[in-house]
Amino acid sequence: MKKILFLSALIVGTSFFATAQKEYKLQYSFKKGDTYEWSQSASSKQHIVGPGFDQNNETVVKTNAVMKIMEVTPKGAKFEIEYTKLSTSTSNPQTNIQMDSEGDTAKNLPNKIMRAMKGKKFNFTLTKDGAVESIENVENLWSGLTAANGFNETQIVTMKQSLENSFGKNAIKLNLEVAMVRYPEHKIKVGLNWNSKTETGTPIPLKTENVWTLESAEDPAATVVADGQITTTDTTKVITLPPGLRATTNFKGRRVVKSHINLGTGWPETSRAYAEQKGFMVLLAGGQIPEDMKMDVDVNIDAEYAIKKK
């Protein structure tokens, strides 16, 4: 009986050890012509305190897009992407603006602008490891904002400035990087970590040092978590904010992303991201700003992403 018990324990222990030690080579699979539906829902809440004021701002962005693989390369793939639905809402003590590509455009200029951005194609490249290497032809998003479509020059300039933070090149790259899991070059086991780094300007120059973990894996699915430390890369860099204000920034924070992936294809199916940043910006003297003005800023961002192959 003791021998039987010993053999049973040995079999169970060996089975557990084999399962725990299983290795996975995580990477994206690409095929020319494959098409994916991508959806994003993100909210950003800002608490700003400055000389004589205390203000809360909130921005909500929701988009649906179609991504098509146009070319497969040894390193990855080149995609063509276009928005099929866009909406944003911005609220603060001074204003409340709703913009919806599916809303009435006859009397609503913001809706008309969103509608004009639908179907405008641009490109990005993605490596097998999940690095977003380039964003190209983003200027096509604004190609519908023309006099022929009923927009005057002032409207075009003003709206492009206000939408740059959500739909500019840097913002799009950041959203793709958060939605796409970054994989290691080597094989990985459950519970082990790997690192990646991203740098973006939105327009604030930020760097995120990510520690990724394969939290769980059971064919055909797995869960991956990224825990990232956010810092400002250049606290002396002067950035431009709407409507033409100049400022320097200094932020630190944390971003956590949890993604459910397909082990066979490497593609994330759903992702949830949360980020918090704290610090300050200094509005530089000039125009309506008589002297440098320091403002303490807290930012909380909550975002969800979903990707589905058509």
What positions do the PLM features span?
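Bacterial Sec-dependent N-terminal signal peptides
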Residues: M1-L26
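Signature of exported/secreted
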Residues: Q21-K310
